[in-house]
Amino acid sequence: MRVKTGIIRRKRHKRVLKAAKGFRGASGDAFKQAKQATRRAMAFATRDRKVNKRRMRQLWITRINSAARMNGVSYSVLMNGLKKAGILLDRKVLADIALNNATEFTKLVEAAKSAL
């Protein structure tokens, strides 16, 4: 007896179309286009999770550099001074302090300068 793929196919199509919900045009309605669009979307999502980490680090460095230059020191000199002073704060925390707590950041810069 021949086995038909009715239930399995419907389940597979339903899963793909559910993942393609909200896509424009045939990409959200037609199975073949939805399958291609979701595969592409998943590839972009995988790539962009890594890109996002790079962009955030870049943003933190830009913020730290900007705040450091307002205090008369460059980013590289600040980071070297902090390392020599034994202040182990990562870039995410430093950027947050620079953005929200300028007086505390100034104290960190002074500590870095004195360690050099």
UniProtKB/Swiss-Prot annotation:
Q: Which GO terms describe its cellular component?
A: cytosolic large ribosomal subunit
Keywords assigned by UniProt, alphabetized = Ribonucleoprotein, Ribosomal protein, RNA-binding, rRNA-binding
Q: What is a GO molecular function of this protein?
A: structural constituent of ribosome
- Show the PROSITE patterns listed in the entry: RIBOSOMAL_L20
**What function does the entry list?**
Binds directly to 23S ribosomal RNA and is necessary for the in vitro assembly process of the 50S ribosomal subunit. It is not involved in the protein synthesizing functions of that subunit.
Q: State the similarity comment.
A: Belongs to the bacterial ribosomal protein bL20 family.
Protein name, entry field: Large ribosomal subunit protein bL20
